[in-house]
Amino acid sequence: MPMVSAQVDDTERYTVRDYVRELAATGGSTMLIGGQILDLEGEHKQLSEPEVRAVYEGKTAALLTTALRFGAMSANATEAQLEAVTDFGYNLGLAFQVIDDILDLTASTEKLGKTAGKDVNAQKSTCPALIGMDGARSEAKCRTQAALDALMIFPEERRTRLVELANYLLNREY
């Protein structure tokens, strides 16, 4: 099996060690693993908005942010650009999860391609359950706009695809 260093080249700003550090931080107890634990422990309990946000942050937002940071690092992003991509990923990840929870309540199993209503059946606290459908839609729009605002550091031609992605995710039906 090849070593990580054989698959990833250093850039002017980032080394293989930086990528490994990013990956380790994302997978750790405060991010993906921690988010999954919070999610499982939250079943059959009434979580507060900050607790639900912590689940979203630790799972969807962390995963999306890390993927985007890897792309930015491989493109030799400056510190300011990396921060902008981080903000974009964080907010887009939260918006994605809110929309996912809305779709779990409103879309069919056939449309989703997965079992609809799983959150209700597991008695999970979700954004729509806590603040209603209109509040959840508003939250998703606000988070998407915050994600788009974070990209303003980049020239228009460099952000077009990410803007399209953000708008697609906000308006998706599955």
Predicted regions and their residues:
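All-alpha prenyltransferase/terpene-synthase fold signal
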Residues: M1-Y174
